[in-house]
Amino acid sequence: MKSAVENLTPTRVKLNVEVPFEELKPSIDEAYKTVASQIQVPGFRKGKVPAKLIDQRVGRGYVLETAINEGLNGWYQEAVQETGIRPLSRPEVEITEVPDPTATDGELKFHAEVDVRPEIELPDYSGIKVEVAAAESSEADVDKALDELRGRFGTLKSVDRPAADGDFLTIDITASIDGAEVDSASGLSYQVGAGTMLEGLDEAVTGLSADEDAIFDTTLVGGDHAGEAAQVKVVVKSVKERELPEADDDFAQLASEFDTLAELREDLAKQAAESKVVEQGVEARDKVLDKLVELVEVPVPASVVEEQLEQHFKAENSHGDGEHDTEEHRAEVKANTERAFQNEIILDAIADKEEVGVSQNELIDYIVTTASQYGMDPNQFAQIIDQSGQVPMMVSEVRRRKALAVVLGQAEVTDSEGNKVDLSDFVRPGGEEEAAEAEAAPAVDSDAVEGEAATEEAAPSDDPAAVKF
């Protein structure tokens, strides 16, 4: 078999393949067996019909067509291996020549157009310089953390006053379009200022007391009338404020392992300082990635991006989030997908250059960490990703994290005050970023984790938009 690559664009090639008759013949022999098992001829058992009789009954041309259909993918895969291309999408195949059905020689010729991973030239990435914010925590950070902790132990208390920011309300709402009621809901709980329901709701309820109402104009975001302008009436049924426990030694004993408030504040101060270091590491990681993308031109195949977009919005629609399929949101998702693809290509190239590997223990650690993010048993999670074919994707993800850790380890990072930043607490000895576990979205299809069937990708490695740094 002969195969040759014709470059169409930096991300698309045409694979020209020629299969000689001697390599086509085994497929023809198998095709005769297939056809023999499909037809019935008096005097012959099923599957035992002679080839000459098959030619008379269905024609040798049909047998040849069957042989080509059954063997085409194998010849394509062989050509991919021979040429070393790395496909990202399913090929568009066109058969240009077939042997004469009446002859015993000739060639099968076809070409396949397919998107491929672009080849890039890596720059010198040692000593990349970035500046990050100073990792300084303050008493205000401790106070904020303490208030958040008190909030977890707070109680709601009814108040006889107008609603204010942060209050908790029970409300009834009714939506009307052109004077006709289209939707309503009663007994909804809502925190003033949350901004999680309807645009304009916070302004409408602020200043209302129990049993008072207001009418405001807004755009509906769910249901049959999503995206339509409507007039909404909101009735406040109750107003409650959160009553926080006193910050004292008793609270420290209730909410923590410490006996005194001073000890609790000391621990919160330590956590705040560690959090600032993690934030600093995340900022350094993101800025190093930004620098790499600036230094390397990575062409992005449009068809791959479009496929990812369709998969994204198909998943959103299946979960009832179709109202978010707007032009603005599509542009945002498209930009994020393109950037994620560029990150993947660059980090894969660095991993190749640095000969980065992934040990079984590193993969297990990553699976355990990701499982905890989903609140799942690691063994159950591992079984799900194995059944959905996502293990190679996770291996690639760990490998990219290690590649990024290599670059981070060589980067020159200073804070806004000119101090050199030590990332040793952020980058693990094994190469995986400490903060990436919490900050980066897991490169696992959440639909598969929830038990839905994962879509099998044509790419030889993994989903090109899966890396979410």
UniProtKB/Swiss-Prot annotation:
| Gene Ontology biological-process annotations | 'de novo' cotranslational protein folding; cell division; chaperone-mediated protein folding; protein transport; protein unfolding
Compartments annotated for it: namely:
Cytoplasm
Query: For the region Disordered, what residue ranges are annotated?
Result: 430-469
Q: Does the keyword Cytoplasm apply?
A: yes
Q: Does Cytoplasm show up as a keyword for this record?
A: yes
Which catalysed reactions does the entry list for this protein? [protein]-peptidylproline (omega=180) = [protein]-peptidylproline (omega=0)
Q: Give the Gene Ontology MF terms in alphabetical order.
A: peptidyl-prolyl cis-trans isomerase activity; protein folding chaperone; ribosome binding
Indicate the principal place this protein occupies in or around the cell.
Answer: cytoplasm
Provide the E.C. number(s) assigned to this enzyme.
5.2.1.8
Coiled coil feature spans: none
Q: Which GO terms describe its cellular component?
A: cytoplasm
Q: Which UniProt keywords apply?
A: Cell cycle, Cell division, Chaperone, Cytoplasm, Isomerase, Rotamase
Which residues does the UniProt record annotate as the domain PPIase FKBP-type? 166-245
Primary role = Involved in protein export. Acts as a chaperone by maintaining the newly synthesized protein in an open conformation. Functions as a peptidyl-prolyl cis-trans isomerase.
Task: Reproduce the free-text note on domains from the UniProt record.
Answer: Consists of 3 domains; the N-terminus binds the ribosome, the middle domain has PPIase activity, while the C-terminus has intrinsic chaperone activity on its own.
- HAMAP family reported in the protein's UniProt record: Trigger_factor_Tig
Protein family per UniProt: Belongs to the FKBP-type PPIase family. Tig subfamily.
Protein name (record): Trigger factor
Give the gene that encodes this protein: tig
